[in-house]
Design a protein with these regions (language model features):
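N-terminal pre-P-loop "Q-motif" helix
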Residues: 2-15
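Alpha-helical sensor/transducer elements of the RecA-like P-loop NTPase core
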Residues: 11, 37, 85-153, 157, ...
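P-loop NTPase Walker A phosphate-binding motif
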Residues: 28-48
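Amphipathic alpha-helical "lid/sensor" segments that cap RecA-like P-loop NTPase cores
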Residues: 32, 38-39, 121-122, 140-192, ...
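Conserved catalytic segments around the Walker B and adjacent sensor/switch elements
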Residues: 44-58
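Conserved P-loop NTPase "ATPase switch" module shared by AAA+ and STAND
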Residues: 62-83
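C-terminal boundary/linker of central alpha/beta nucleotide-binding cores
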Residues: 149, 192-270
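Extended alpha-helical scaffolding segments used for macromolecular assembly and cargo binding
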Residues: 275-360, 364-372
Length: 375
């Protein structure tokens, strides 16, 4: 296993600076980024005291005897203020010692003073994601070199997520070729790992909250509150920001899920939610966007939610607000998603379909809708 540990140049550079003149090295990334094994590999040969926060026997050392580096895994589980203060005191008091802290969460507020003072370096997902050279090196080490086109496909599928790449590499040991079937198998292996290592560890309200936000590429507190019906939506988003690294900023007061985690959540939603329940969530999102007069996103939600009457209503309203050929081109996919009987019930929609058919050089279809409109 150790031979497959890749130390990226940026991680090595940060580690060397930390050992030379830093005090704290903080790893902040979701599960599957190899934080623990990377830290252990970097610290090989050092006198390390390893602890895991949240364990029943967890206790900080009383002094600096018998260790040069204090390694604490799962730091987000250190929730008691006396422990937090004690760790800060150790960092301040023992300037000659080093502290390596691993967490699936963000840097907690009680440690930020060390970051602002230049005493703490942070290795986040950007520093730990693998690139083409890393992927090439991994496959070469295990004796299954791959071509550039396969590396491109692996990078596209995994976005450089270390666990995803490692699972694909493992499945290709023995000469199995890269294929869509292999990728599907690897996705399922990673998803089952996520389910056990991450998802099932959340409380039920958080799990439900995550699933109901999964269909939306980005969201704010208001959308989260509307689609989940949870009055504590803002509090839950704050908890997720602090205790996980699954949320990414997507603008002012806007969030999105880390891409691989969102894909997992959609997979989990398909398993746990009925079609009716999934449509309900999407249509709530459609209502949110409709109230914001963001008709493009509202139409997308209502279409996926199968609410044809709302799609019809918004297409008519949008055509009134934006008359002209551009409207029809932009909204074509929503017109074509409607059943013919829904279109035939609205003169405005029949006119729109006639125009769309003409734009597509489907003159027979255009004439058919024009004749239906005239009757």
């Amino acid at each position: 296993m150790a031979k497959n540990v890749l130390i990226r140049p940026l991680a090595r550079e940060q580690y060397d600076k930390f050992m030379a003149r830093g005090r704290v090295l903080f790893f902040s990334a979701p599960c599957g980024f190899g934080k623990s094994i990377l830290a252990e590999t970097l610290l090989a040969g050092q006198q390390v005291l390893s602890l895991t926060a949240g364990e029943p026997d967890f206790a900080l050392p009383a002094d600096d005897k018998d260790w040069q580096v204090l390694l604490i895994d799962d730091l987000r589980q250190m929730t008691e203020e006396p422990d937090q203060q004690a760790l800060c005191q150790l960092i301040r008091e023992y300037a000659g010692r080093r502290f390596v802290l691993l967490s699936r969460g963000a840097v907690p507020g009680w440690l930020m003073a060390f970051q602002y003072a230049g005493l703490m370096a942070v290795l986040d997902t950007n520093a730990l994601l693998w690139d083409r050279e890393d992927i090439r090196t991994l496959f070469h080490r295990q004796g299954t070199p791959v071509g550039e086109s396969v590396i491109t496909e692996i990078l596209r599928e995994t976005s450089g997520y270390p666990l995803g790449v490692a699972v694909i590499a493992h499945c290709m040991v023995g000469g199995r070729p890269y294929s869509p079937e292999l990728v599907a198998q690897c996705y399922h292996e990673v998803f089952f790992y996520f389910e056990t290592a991450v998802y099932r560890r959340f409380d039920l309200p958080i799990r439900r909250f995550l699933l109901e936000l999964a269909p939306f590429e980005s969201f704010d507190v208001e959308l989260a509150r509307m689609v989940s019906g949870d009055p504590r939506a803002g509090e839950r988003l704050g908890w997720l920001q602090q205790n996980t690294t699954m949320l990414r900023p997507a603008g002012v007061n806007q969030f999105r899920f880390w891409a691989q985690f969102r894909t997992f959540l959609l997979w989990e939603m398909d398993r746990e939610y009925s079609d009716e329940k999934r449509r309900t969530v999407l249509n709530r999102g459609g209502l949110y966007y409709e109230l914001k007069e963001d008709y493009s996103h509202a139409l997308e939600c209502y279409t996926m939610g199968g609410d044809h009457s709302k799609v019809s209503e918004l297409l008519v309203r949008n055509a009134e607000l934006h008359p002209g050929m551009g409207h029809y081109s932009e909204m074509e996919k929503y017109y074509r998603s409607l059943p013919e009987q829904e279109i035939a019930a609205s003169p405005a929609l029949m006119q729109g379909m006639s125009m769309l058919c003409a734009l597509a050089a489907d003159y027979e279809g255009s004439e058919r809708w024009y004749q239906a409109l005239s009757q």
